Amino acid sequence: MAANEKMDVTVKTLDSQTRTFTVEAEILVKEFKAHISSAVGITPEKQRLIYQGRVLQEDKKLNEYNVDGKVIHLVERAPPQTQTSTSGPSTSSSTSPSSSNAAPVPGAPERNGNSYVMVGTFNLPHVMSGLGEASRGPSVSTISGSEPRVRLVLAQNILQDIQRNLDRLEGQPGNEQAAEPMDTAESEGEASSRETLPQTTQNADGQSNSTPTSHPSPSEYVEVLQSLSRVEERLAPFMQRYREILSSATSDTYENQEREQSQRIINLVGESLRLLGNALVAVSDLRCNLSSASPRHLHVVRPMSHYSGPMLLQQAAIPIQINVGTTVSTTGNGTHAGHVPSDGNATPSTNTSEHQRSNSENQPPPSGERPASDAPPNSVPHPHPRVIRITHQTVEPVMMMHMNIQDSASGGPTNIPPPTAGHGGSAHIHMPGLPPEFMQAISNQITQQAMAAASGQQIPGFQAPPRFVFTRPAAPSFNFQPGAAATTPPAPGGATTTAPGATVGPAGNASLAQMISGLVGQLLMHPVVVAQGGSSTSSTTSTSTSTSTSSSTSSSSSTVPTSTTTTTSTSFPNVSSVPSAQLPPGTDQHLSQLLGSLLGTASSGMSNLTMGSPSITVTVPGMPAFLQGVTDILQATQTVPVSTSPPQSASQAPPPPSSPAPPAHSAPPPAAAPESLPPEFFTSVVQGVLSSMLGSLSAADQSGTESIADFIQRLSGSHNIFQPDAEGPGGFFGDLLTLICHNFSLVDMVMLLHGHSQPLQNLQPQLRSFFLQEYLHQADPTPNNIQMASRNLTNGLEEYIRESFASVTVRDDVDITRTNLEFLQDQFNRITTHILHCADSTFGQRLLEMCNQSLFEWLALNLYCLRGDQNALTSVINERIRRLSLDVSPVLVSWVTSVLSLRLQVLLGQMPVTEGEIQRHVRRVGDASQVPEPSSQEQPMETMPVDFQQNGAASPVPATTVEEVLFLPPQSSVPTICPDSEHPTQGDSVSEQWTASVPPEWVPVIRQDLQNQRKIKQQPPLSDAYLSGMPAKRRKTMQGEGPHLSLSEAVSRAMKVTGAKPESSTECVKRELDNSEAQGEYKEQLCQDIQEILQDDESYTAQRFPNTHRAFRGDP
């Protein structure tokens, strides 16, 4: 190839744009990068050319890769997090700004300006598993060094960005690409100052070498301040021009070029001011203690997380995919160790911090929160949470996530043992209760909305929800000495009130802000710790306590602030030993149980803690109903009620009760305390919490009245799950499930889980009508009819029970099938009697109590039968749920089973039913049946009308004897469930109906047949087996057709099937077949054929089928 030969190369960038360049064939790859840098807007140092999966090496020629006329891909390298300058030319080349021609707006910053971490696409479970390093103690070594070192490095990086902006301001518009920003004397001085800072370096091979870190000296701080001064001097003339432009911007008219230059100055100066402010914030907390021994070092008075809001919630909008061009800013600042040396030089913990990219870091603290800068430098600060923040660079309110991880070693005494696994030092952080598949399904929808909003697209039906800031002021100082007078905060307009052994009322206990924020925080990961506002001059001791939650097996960390005025800090071992006042089981404890047990937060342990009254700040308009209700309650309880109960010592203070269990040994509540909060308030709270948890999944249900059936159908994408004719479990239980899912919403279910029976009370008419029609089949609701219906229903469950417990190990002497059958029969009798006979206002509450009692007894009974194996019982329940949910989305079923497994473990650990109480329900192998056998002899035939069998959605009717079919009542009659004539307490007139209809010698035969059929599960005929394998909709159609008894219809159908054609017309054949003589001959032939079949059948006995001769021989 000749030296002067040209070649065409097409370069494709990540934005799908292609550019064709004509270059010399012998050009080096390095020279080619420099040639295309001005067109693509990426400096040669950041370019990476890829062709056929290979990276083009810079020292090779372009023609060696045979790219003539081909397409090569250009990607941008991620810049190193820290840059160390070794010389002037290398520094200038590594920090050259990108071309401004690549930006759509003249003068806009480069696409990766201020991005110190560049990521591609990641998903939430992977990131969650790696967040465990953020919660480790201060002993973990990090590459960035100590907190003061991180501050200085952060300031240096920010100064580099400011210098880039200044270089663009000082350079000519047409020569910006060729400008060398680091050639100035000031920049050289800046580079020399950075050489003194030991930090991570990166060589040409990409290997990072970390030097030992230490606390920086004050001289290094002085050099950074000098660099700041030089930057301010360079910025001063542009600030003057900036003010002139803004002063005349209201009414001036501009030419095109003048307008572009002025706009460019406004953009660059504004960005520089923001960066300069961040740099000042980063270094403003550095202090030097002159009273300490030399050599003296710098320390930090507060972590960076102080400058961010304590809690920002965007309805749990979790960004899952973050494309290149966004910024992930992580601030892992810990708090001071809970020890202050005598010389006053506090030792800060070793953590990592990066540049925060949120506008919230410059916002003033909310009202009611006093800046912590008022605290003395040598006082122990309040514990601050670690903050992991993901912020979108374009539209910040759309993608905002704060995950606060409590530092286990912060703020506590030095003699506290290290945290155990799952408390503060766990290696990995998981999300209990939500499987990765379900989180991924939710996250995909949220990600699409977040990304579309970031790019300016509109999503139908999506409205940006309001952003809330939940804050809590610092707890006031109380003297918690047993028997001493407790000082309560003064009420508005009142003076401070003291009373011996005062019990702090609802406004002083169980911070509502912490419960709600922890509730949503549990959805993300560990419970969220709301930041403490203000400061206290007295020494404060914080004790981290591990509390067991009610709906999750993971242990959660709750911080118990306890203030004392003595000089000795006291550490309490657990929550129950804190001699704080008892919370009456009324307003806030009920709300604590409601919110605390929903997702397993530490609210149940917070109900007995004395904290400051919460304050809730709404940052944007649009307050939902539940937050409005919370605000109303807080305003209504500003006056702290004080009771005069006798003082209680620390040893007598009972532990906080668990959420499902009622509070025991607690102080008596004030008058009418349980009635202070109406059910409507709890409904609004639950509705708001569910809306925050589900995020975009609940966007279609703004009113909170969407039924569970509609919700599941919307998630699964199928619209026939809960239809009467759809495939499903069928039968009585399928219809009952359909009724509940169509009438209950998610809010109703949560209310029922927390003891509110109003949804059941509202469902009373539908339940009564359903049980009368589907359970008793329009029979009178007498005790005997209810008992008979219960036996019929439970007998049909025998195969299901045997199949469910076939894969687990049962006690050798226990008949688990008969145990469950008789237990369910007894419970159905009780519940059905209550539903059909109770008509007062206690219907819902009593029904809920009966269902809960039955559930606990069933769990305890089967747990005993399974030898106490909880995993076996959980697998039995989950397997049944999976079989009943074949048409539901597998992701949703997996989530339901996971949540149910966690909830079941908690319930089994708090079982109120003892093993001795359920022994009466246990049935042993070989024992004589006390209830089923006599009842099987007394039980009459099932009197279900034929039209119900044809029109119902139940499974096919099992095979019955000929006698049962013959003595079914006609379709027009009202069915009754008739008892046996030998029943001592029932009417003889009703019981004589079926026995009087047959000869007396056949009564024992029928009874024996019924008993045998109920004792042994017979194999169904082939016809029933065929029907049972059909879909429910097809099976119903088949059952509804009925037999064709007309001879003419039968022959016509046979002709159509076989394709035969009559010699005469079809009408003529029909007339001949409708003749009575032909009908008689046909019937006679049919009976003769059946008689021959019966004679050849060895299993046929005339004693078992005594009416055969009357049916097929025409005998009278």
Swiss-Prot record:
Q: Name one GO molecular function term.
A: proteasome binding
Residue ranges of domain Ubiquitin-like in the record = 7-82
Q: Show the ranges annotated as biased composition (Polar residues).
A: 194-207, 344-353
Q: Which UniProt keywords apply?
A: Apoptosis, Chaperone, Chromatin regulator, Cytoplasm, Nucleus, Secreted, Transport
Q: Which intervals carry biased composition (Low complexity)?
A: 79-100, 208-219, 482-502, 535-580, 641-652
**Which segments carry the region annotation Disordered?**
76-114, 170-221, 329-385, 473-502, 533-589, 640-678, 1058-1080
Stretches that traverse the bilayer: none
Q: Name one Pfam family in it.
A: ubiquitin
Task: Quote the biased-composition stretches of kind Pro residues, using this chain's numbering.
Answer: 653-672
Sorted alphabetically, the Gene Ontology BP terms of this entry are:
brain development; chromatin organization; endoplasmic reticulum stress-induced pre-emptive quality control; ERAD pathway; internal peptidyl-lysine acetylation; intrinsic apoptotic signaling pathway in response to DNA damage by p53 class mediator; intrinsic apoptotic signaling pathway in response to endoplasmic reticulum stress; kidney development
Describe the subunit structure.
Component of the bag6/bat3 complex.
Return the protein name.
Large proline-rich protein bag6-B
Organism expressing this protein natively: Xenopus laevis (African clawed frog)
